A protein has these predicted regions:
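Short hydrophobic-aromatic micro-motifs
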Residues: 35-38, 86-88, 114-116
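Active-site HxH/HxHxD metal-binding segment of metal-dependent hydrolases
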Residues: 17, 23, 40-109
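A mid-sequence, solvent-exposed acidic-amphipathic segment
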Residues: 101-123
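Short, glycine/serine-rich, charged loops/turns that create anion-binding
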Residues: 11, 41, 123
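Hydrophobic/aromatic beta-strand patches that form the interior of the parallel beta-sheet core
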Residues: 5-7, 66, 87, 117
Protein backbone atom coordinates (compact mmCIF):
# COMPACT_ATOMS: atom_id res chain seq x y z
CA UNK A 1 0.00 0.00 0.00
CA UNK A 2 1.24 3.48 -0.86
CA UNK A 3 0.85 6.19 1.79
CA UNK A 4 1.25 9.92 1.10
CA UNK A 5 2.07 12.21 4.03
CA UNK A 6 2.65 15.95 4.02
CA UNK A 7 5.61 16.51 6.33
CA UNK A 8 5.40 20.28 5.99
CA UNK A 9 2.66 22.24 4.22
CA UNK A 10 3.72 24.97 1.86
CA UNK A 11 2.38 28.49 1.76
CA UNK A 12 2.40 31.77 -0.13
CA UNK A 13 1.41 34.94 1.72
CA UNK A 14 1.53 38.54 0.53
CA UNK A 15 3.98 40.48 2.68
CA UNK A 16 3.43 43.96 1.21
CA UNK A 17 5.87 46.20 -0.64
CA UNK A 18 5.86 43.83 -3.62
CA UNK A 19 7.10 40.88 -1.54
CA UNK A 20 5.70 37.49 -0.58
CA UNK A 21 6.51 34.94 2.08
CA UNK A 22 6.61 31.49 0.54
CA UNK A 23 7.90 28.01 1.24
CA UNK A 24 7.24 24.73 -0.54
CA UNK A 25 5.49 21.63 0.69
CA UNK A 26 7.59 18.62 1.73
CA UNK A 27 5.89 15.28 1.11
CA UNK A 28 6.81 11.70 2.02
CA UNK A 29 5.49 8.85 -0.11
CA UNK A 30 5.86 5.40 1.45
CA UNK A 31 5.38 2.18 -0.44
CA UNK A 32 7.64 -0.46 -1.93
CA UNK A 33 9.95 2.54 -2.47
CA UNK A 34 10.18 5.62 -0.25
CA UNK A 35 10.16 9.07 -1.84
CA UNK A 36 10.55 12.63 -0.64
CA UNK A 37 8.90 15.17 -2.92
CA UNK A 38 10.72 18.50 -2.57
CA UNK A 39 13.21 18.88 0.27
CA UNK A 40 12.29 22.41 1.31
CA UNK A 41 14.60 25.26 2.17
CA UNK A 42 17.84 24.80 4.11
CA UNK A 43 16.06 25.95 7.30
CA UNK A 44 13.68 22.95 6.95
CA UNK A 45 16.43 20.41 7.69
CA UNK A 46 15.23 19.78 11.26
CA UNK A 47 11.64 19.30 10.13
CA UNK A 48 12.71 16.63 7.64
CA UNK A 49 14.95 14.77 10.08
CA UNK A 50 12.40 14.88 12.91
CA UNK A 51 9.57 13.80 10.61
CA UNK A 52 11.53 10.86 9.23
CA UNK A 53 12.53 9.76 12.74
CA UNK A 54 8.90 9.97 13.87
CA UNK A 55 7.98 7.69 10.94
CA UNK A 56 10.73 5.20 11.83
CA UNK A 57 12.87 6.21 8.86
CA UNK A 58 16.31 7.68 8.34
CA UNK A 59 17.75 9.54 5.37
CA UNK A 60 19.20 6.26 4.08
CA UNK A 61 15.69 4.80 3.81
CA UNK A 62 14.71 7.29 1.10
CA UNK A 63 15.04 5.69 -2.34
CA UNK A 64 14.04 8.69 -4.47
CA UNK A 65 14.11 12.46 -4.07
CA UNK A 66 11.73 14.15 -6.48
CA UNK A 67 12.11 17.92 -6.87
CA UNK A 68 9.39 19.59 -8.86
CA UNK A 69 11.76 22.36 -9.90
CA UNK A 70 15.04 23.96 -8.90
CA UNK A 71 13.94 26.81 -6.63
CA UNK A 72 15.66 26.96 -3.23
CA UNK A 73 12.47 26.11 -1.33
CA UNK A 74 12.30 22.81 -3.22
CA UNK A 75 15.95 21.60 -3.26
CA UNK A 76 17.42 23.01 -0.03
CA UNK A 77 18.08 19.67 1.66
CA UNK A 78 18.87 17.41 -1.25
CA UNK A 79 22.32 16.84 0.24
CA UNK A 80 20.78 14.82 3.09
CA UNK A 81 19.88 11.96 0.74
CA UNK A 82 23.25 10.84 -0.65
CA UNK A 83 22.10 7.32 -1.56
CA UNK A 84 18.87 8.30 -3.30
CA UNK A 85 18.03 8.57 -6.97
CA UNK A 86 17.27 12.22 -7.75
CA UNK A 87 14.55 13.31 -10.12
CA UNK A 88 14.89 17.06 -10.48
CA UNK A 89 12.76 18.66 -13.16
CA UNK A 90 13.52 16.42 -16.15
CA UNK A 91 16.78 14.89 -14.89
CA UNK A 92 17.09 11.47 -13.26
CA UNK A 93 20.42 10.73 -11.60
CA UNK A 94 22.25 8.77 -8.96
CA UNK A 95 25.60 10.44 -8.45
CA UNK A 96 27.05 11.15 -11.88
CA UNK A 97 24.99 8.44 -13.65
CA UNK A 98 21.99 9.87 -15.52
CA UNK A 99 18.98 7.95 -16.81
CA UNK A 100 17.58 9.30 -20.06
CA UNK A 101 13.80 9.65 -20.03
CA UNK A 102 11.40 11.79 -22.05
CA UNK A 103 8.82 12.94 -19.50
CA UNK A 104 6.79 14.63 -22.23
CA UNK A 105 6.07 11.25 -23.83
CA UNK A 106 5.40 8.99 -20.83
CA UNK A 107 5.55 8.80 -17.05
CA UNK A 108 8.67 7.54 -15.28
CA UNK A 109 7.65 4.50 -13.23
CA UNK A 110 9.36 4.36 -9.83
CA UNK A 111 7.48 1.35 -8.46
CA UNK A 112 4.06 -0.20 -8.79
CA UNK A 113 1.57 2.57 -8.07
CA UNK A 114 4.17 5.35 -8.14
CA UNK A 115 4.91 7.22 -11.37
CA UNK A 116 6.42 10.63 -12.05
CA UNK A 117 4.74 12.80 -14.67
CA UNK A 118 5.63 16.20 -16.08
CA UNK A 119 3.39 18.98 -14.77
CA UNK A 120 4.76 22.24 -16.18
CA UNK A 121 4.02 25.07 -13.79
CA UNK A 122 5.38 28.44 -12.83
CA UNK A 123 8.92 27.60 -14.00
CA UNK A 124 7.99 26.34 -17.48
Amino acid sequence: MTVVQVLKPGYTIEAGNGQIRADGTITLIRGTKNLIVDTGSPHDRGIILESLTREGLGVGDIDYVVCTHGHCDHIGNNNLFQGAVFIVCHDISRGDLYTLHDFSRKPYVVAEGISIIATPGHTS
